[in-house]
Structure formats: C-alpha cells, structure tokens
Amino acid sequence: ETPALVVAHGSIKRVSNFPSTFVNPRNIDIWLPDHYSKGKKYAVIYMHDGQMLFDSAINWNHQEWGVDETMGRLINEQKIKECIVVGIWNTPKRHSEYFPQKPFESLSQAGKDTVTKQLQSTGKTDKAFQPVSDNYLKFIVTELKPFIDSTFSTYTDRRNTFIAGSSMGGLISMYAICEYPEVFGGAACMSTHWPGTFTTNNNPVPSAFV
C-alpha cells in the first residue's frame, strides 16, 4: 500500500486502481487547492506520470515535480485561476500508452520495424512494438474525466480543461489535444520526447508527426 502523500499546499484525494475497459487499472491522485469548496467551480489539469508530481518520498528517484508547491504559489499570487490537478499514474506500459498511435500506424512496415528494433535495443519492448495511446486517451476522455466532473466541482468545458506532461508525457499531451481538440483547450508539452525512440539516426518517427 502506497503511503499517504505529503503536500505543501492543498490536499490529495486518491482513487486506488481506478478501473477501465481500455487500459490497466492505475492510481489517480487528485490535488485540490487550499480552501477547495463545492460552492465554486474549478478548471482541471490532467497530468501524466502522476506518481512523480507531488511527493518525492514515493518515487524511485526520490524526485518530484513540486506541483503542489508551484500551483499553490501561483494561485496565492493570483497568477493563475484556481484549478484541480489530476495525476494519472503511469504503468509498465508507459511507452506504448504515451506513444502517438496514428502517426506510428502511418509508417511503412519497414518504418515500424525500425522503431521496434530501436526500442528493443533500449529494453522498452521485447516484441513487435504497438502503441496503445488511442485507448489511453479514450480512458482519460470517456472514463476518467466524467468521474472527475461528477465527483468534484469543475468547469467541464474545453476552455477549462488542460493536459500536461514531460518527455513521453509531453508527446502524449500533444497527441491528446490533436485527437480531442473539443475536450482540451490547452496542452503543456515539456521537454517533449520528439524522437519517440532513443536515437535520431534513421528514425522515421518525427516526420510522421508532421
């Protein structure tokens, strides 16, 4: 059992092993700002790699993004509007869940084989690589978002719904806003892992995004 998270601002509500018909169950950590009230409505930011966001004590590398500190400070300084952050934990399928599926499927078979070999060489897959990011986004849009909107006091429109991540999380955030522009009004794609694999030599992936 993962210990309760320690945050500097606001509070965390955890849903353990959130079920899905599209992806494997995973923990969801919902950060609520200081003075959260059912009498107000809040924008929502969906963030990938949820276990890395709030508390370094639970992470493999003992580092965290400091999302609670940063969001709390920016809200208190009135630099951003009050919002909720939904931290979506990753799983061992992280690379295939975060890898944009339609660009991959647009590659020739030779291109797909090249990607598979490049990912096999770094231990990211032990078989033919197949992204499952379309199902990951269906999980967020059709299962997780309705739960968040029905459980917490949120604005549900695209102007108040955002998605964010770093590295492969940046890549899937880019894919999310392209696939669901009617759902997400903005995406923060930080240090985006544009190569998709771990080499730029003979890599067909970046051109597939164009």
Predicted regions and their residues:
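Non-catalytic cap/lid and distal C-terminal segments of serine-dependent acyl enzymes
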Residues: 2-210
